[in-house]
Swiss-Prot record:
Gene Ontology CC entries for this record: host cell cytoplasm; viral capsid, major subunit
Keywords linked to the UniProt accession: Capsid protein, Host cytoplasm, Late protein, Viral capsid assembly, Viral release from host cell, Virion
Induction summary: Expressed in the late phase of the viral replicative cycle. Expression of late genes is activated by the viral late transcription activator C.
Protein name: Major capsid protein
Function: Capsid protein that self-assembles to form an icosahedral capsid, about 54 nm in diameter.
Assembly and interaction partners: Part of the immature prohead complex. Interaction between the viral portal protein and the viral protease I may give rise to an early 25S initiator complex. The scaffolding protein Z and the capsid protein T should then be added to the initiator complex to yield immature procapsid. Host GroEL and GroES are also essential for the correct assembly of viral capsids.
Compartments in which it is found: Virion; Host cytoplasm
Keyword set includes ATP-binding: no
A matching Pfam family: Mu-like_gpT
Keyword presence, NAD: no
Length: 305
């Protein structure tokens, strides 16, 4: 093949189609548990959540003030992946191997939101949310008066089993427009190229560069919508996590009306979760009992947790 702008453009059209196919075919889970925000600036500050009167009433004025005072914001980051294609491969028509590479680039860009969101859950024991405490923490302050005054009572959104060393699972309330996690996108994934014959890289290294680029980020929403269970995936521990979320109150003792809708587990707990959520009956000693959790939760087996 003679390397000309027209021949490169024709190949780019084909490879963009492969890239787009990878984007569209990749499975995703993040939007089940995260609020998706279209970003238009370098970072988003989430004090704007307080502009919704019903939300301010629900979480309390102090919570919104905290978000504003702490400047709780999520800064967008640029992510890119690049592949170099030898000019010799162009000239020798050795290009068939690259179509699946571009398709995989599209797939990688599509699953990255899952990687970001589920990493938030995993890191939630060490990363702070709007109140300055870690997202999963035993000392989230809740105040006795509606205006946020009085001596704060520490509230935990962690259930912890003694001597447990395995993988935790998570209960989330995703029934509302505002969800426990936030995914924001500044620029959707796009395929870009450096293919001018007189580009320095083409001249020096004898290869054209193609890359996928996007700007996005993820962060924490309201900790009240999430409970981490550091314990075996059993019916008893599931009920403990359920009841803990149901007990959450805002400042002044206001009932929040939260209830888990989703259970998120790593792949290592998939079998146990499927059995726990779908079986009609459980063995209890010498008898069987009904499974009262059947059908109560939507299961998310997180590929990137």
């Amino acid at each position: 093949m003679i390397v000309t702008p027209a021949s490169i453009k024709a190949l780019m059209t084909s490879w963009r189609k492969d890239f787009q196919g990878g984007l569209e075919d990749a499975p995703s889970q993040y939007n089940k548990i995260a609020m998706v925000v279209n970003s238009s600036t370098r970072s988003n500050t989430y004090g704007w959540l307080g502009k919704f009167p019903t939300l301010k009433e629900w979480v309390g004025k102090r919570t919104i003030q905290q978000m504003e005072a702490h400047g709780y914001s999520i800064a967008n980051k640029t992510f890119e992946g690049t592949v170099g294609i030898s000019r010799d491969d162009f000239e020798d028509d050795n290009l068939g191997i690259y179509a699946p590479i571009f398709q995989e680039m599209g797939r990688s860009a599509a699953v990255q939101p899952d990687e970001l969101i589920f990493k938030l859950l995993k890191d939630g024991f060490t990363q702070p949310c709007y109140d300055g405490q870690n997202f999963f923490d035993k000392e989230h302050p809740v105040y006795p008066n509606v205006d946020g005054t009085g001596s704060a009572v520490n509230t935990s959104n962690i259930v912890e089993q003694d001597s447990f060393s395995g993988l935790p699972f998570y209960l989330l309330d995703c029934s509302r427009a505002v969800k426990p996690l936030i995914f924001q996108e500044r620029r959707k994934p796009e395929l870009v190229a450096r293919t001018r014959i007189d580009d320095d890289h083409v001249f020096m290294d004898n290869e054209f560069l193609f890359g996928a680029s996007t700007r996005r980020a993820a962060g924490y929403g309201f900790w009240q919508m999430a409970v981490a269970v550091k314990g075996d995936l059993t019916l008893d521990n599931l009920w403990k996590g359920w009841q803990l979320m149901r007990s959450f109150e805002g400042d002044g003792g206001k009932k929040l009306g939260l209830k888990p809708t989703h259970i998120v587990v790593p792949v290592g707990l998939e079998k146990a979760a499927e059995q726990l959520l779908n079986r009609e009956l459980f063995a209890d000693g010498n008898t069987t009992v009904s499974n009262e959790m059947k059908g109560k939760l939507q299961l998310v087996v997180a590929d990137y947790l």
